[in-house]
């Protein structure tokens, strides 16, 4: 009888533990180009970087209008002559305990057009290979072993540079209870910064099932040594929303010269029981732009000493690699650079985390094209249905990074010359400001006389 009680207690403890948020990096996968021959790979993984080189992967037949071309001709040398074009498939398994209530798959990027299957059923898909996306796979999973398959398709003439191919950014499995916090609905922003005094605003959204006791949220801001410099306890309202303003007496501002980071800790309680906890690295800093003072960081006017940085890592390929990203940022800082533009696409979380910690300002860019194409099978195929979804994921997923000081909605857009382009620019700018009212929005144009 005593042994039975002990076993029952351990089982309940295991279930209770499973309710708290857990994140697991899914890094061991099998990969195949044809669905027949499989190899073991580590994700992040770029299937094309190992070659072989061949001119056929690189031919694009078009007229580059920016270069004054009026007739289509063959172009080569744009996308690396590596075998990134075509289809590929990844598969892996993971195990869930019986107490798991909510399960999410987070893809930080998958090149390209990923379709995700869980236990043989389609769980979701995305189009843009540079964007992060989340899938609630709770309806498709079971206790025990579960299988995930990801199908990818890189169309020919879909990129003006080497995009890489495959699950080139991390894939994360997130499990949580039925009471949980939404990381993408958690907002941290600096309201006021005057000397060493700061006011910050924190907002979060919680899912709180009824009938399980009163729910509250504890918000803490921790310094680099883990000490709480501000905290509040608040009841969750009927919509699951919590908002608070915190005062920090001896605030340390984030800047490229002193990239000081705090930790935002948000804890959700049902009664006295911890139901979920979220931690994010954040920085206290202000951004402003005006015709009188130009760009200002923390109230000080400064000019960007910036570079355009594509996402690939040279001979390492497109698969994100923290050591290689740190090396890139260190080299640029050594040469006097204090800002990067994520040319010409959405960045990885890993890259932004490095920029946060090392002190590199960022213009986070979105698209190389809108509805009018630069290449035959570019983002123009998806623009109408997907631009709002893509901007939403970019901004909700990255808006708490202190390094990001500007959003960019495009690069050298072909329709910059017409009224349709001007309207699209306005629509996207308004939507960016709706999601984040703390940062300016820009677009990388190539002619000052354009309508946009």
Kindly give the residue locations of the regions a language model identified.
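N-terminal carbohydrate-binding accessory modules
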Residues: 185-188, 265-332, 353
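Substrate-binding/catalytic cleft of secreted carbohydrate-active enzymes
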Residues: 329-330, 339-452
């Amino acid at each position: 009888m005593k042994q039975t009680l002990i076993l029952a207690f351990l089982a309940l403890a295991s279930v209770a533990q499973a309710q708290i948020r857990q994140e697991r990096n899914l890094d061991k996968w099998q990969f195949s180009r044809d669905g027949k021959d499989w190899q073991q790979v580590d994700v992040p993984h770029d299937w094309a970087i190992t070659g072989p080189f061949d001119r056929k992967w690189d031919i694009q037949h078009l007229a580059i209008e920016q270069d004054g071309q009026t007739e289509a001709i063959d172009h080569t040398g744009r996308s690396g002559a590596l075998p990134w074009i075509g289809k590929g498939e990844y598969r892996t398994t993971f195990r869930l305990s019986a107490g798991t209530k909510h399960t999410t798959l987070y893809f930080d990027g998958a090149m390209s057009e990923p379709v995700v299957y869980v236990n043989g059923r389609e769980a979701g898909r995305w189009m843009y290979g540079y964007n992060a996306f989340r899938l609630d796979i709770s309806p498709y999973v079971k206790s025990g072993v579960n299988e995930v398959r990801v199908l990818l398709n890189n169309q020919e003439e879909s990129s003006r540079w080497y995009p890489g191919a495959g699950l080139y950014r991390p894939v994360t499995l997130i499990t949580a209870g039925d009471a949980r916090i939404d990381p993408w609905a958690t907002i941290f922003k600096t309201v006021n910064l005057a000397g060493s005094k700061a006011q910050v605003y924190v907002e979060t959204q919680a899912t709180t099932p009824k009938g399980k006791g009163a729910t509250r949220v504890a918000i803490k801001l921790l310094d680099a040594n883990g000490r709480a410099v501000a905290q509040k306890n608040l009841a969750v309202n009927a919509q699951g929303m919590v908002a608070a303003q915190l005062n920090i007496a001896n605030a340390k501002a984030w800047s490229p010269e002193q990239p000081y980071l705090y930790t935002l800790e948000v804890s959700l309680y049902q009664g006295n029981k911890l139901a979920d906890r979220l931690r994010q690295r954040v920085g206290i800093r202000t951004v402003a732009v005006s015709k009188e003072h130009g760009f200002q960081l923390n109230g000080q006017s400064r000019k960007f000493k910036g570079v355009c940085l594509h996402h690939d890592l040279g001979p390492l390929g497109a698969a994100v690699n923290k050591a290689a990203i740190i090396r890139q940022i260190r080299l640029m800082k050594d040469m006097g650079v204090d800002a990067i533009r994520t040319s010409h696409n959405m960045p990885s979380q890993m890259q932004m985390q490095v920029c946060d910690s090392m002190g590199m300002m960022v213009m986070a860019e979105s698209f190389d094209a809108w509805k009018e194409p630069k290449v035959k099978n570019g983002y123009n195929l998806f623009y109408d249905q997907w631009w709002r979804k893509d901007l939403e994921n970019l901004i909700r997923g990255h808006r708490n990074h202190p390094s990001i000081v500007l959003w960019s909605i495009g690069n050298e857009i072909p329709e910059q010359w017409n009224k349709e382009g001007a309207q699209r620019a306005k629509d996207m700018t308004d939507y960016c400001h709706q999601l984040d009212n703390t940062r300016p929005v820009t677009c990388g144009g190539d002619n000052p006389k354009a309508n946009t």
